[in-house]
Amino acid sequence: MIQPISCGFLIVRGNPIESFLLMKHSRRWDLPKGHVDEGETELQCALRELREETGIVAEDIEIDPTFSYENRYMVNQNRYGGKGVVEKKLLVYLARLKNPVKITVTEHDGYRWFSWKPPHRIQDLTIDSLLETLERHLQQQS
């Protein structure tokens, strides 16, 4: 079984950060992200998923080359055609919106711009640790 890899973006507004975008799933808030297609790089995957799930295109954002976040956690293999559990890799890039854009919701129940007011308690599995890692990164940069 090949390790599932999911890639996405944390999209922020403002400099310094004023807010960040999360997508509403039926039971949780999450990033615009998805699985890498064959022949696709991780960054290409993240950009494709961002466009598909929000309507935000590469020209709308400025990717921060100094930050990326990786997390690994166990998921049921039945989602990927197997049995038992398998380790999944999540890779998240940071990008700032250059200009206001209209969010087009295609695969979720909605979206929300959350205010940047650490500490955040939104979703234990991935979002909270991503935001904590970004907060530490920003403190080191200043």
Predicted features and spans:
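Unchanged
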Residues: V36-I127
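Short, solvent-exposed loop/turn segments at secondary-structure junctions
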Residues: R27-R28, P119
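Conserved N-terminal beta-strand and adjoining loop/helix that marks the start
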Residues: M1-S19
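A short gly/proline-enriched turn/hairpin at secondary-structure junctions
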Residues: D30-G34
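Short connector loops at helix/strand junctions that flank enzyme active sites
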Residues: P4-S6, S26, V85-L90
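Short, acidic/hydrophobic/Gly-rich beta-strand patch recurrent on exposed beta strands
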Residues: L21-K24
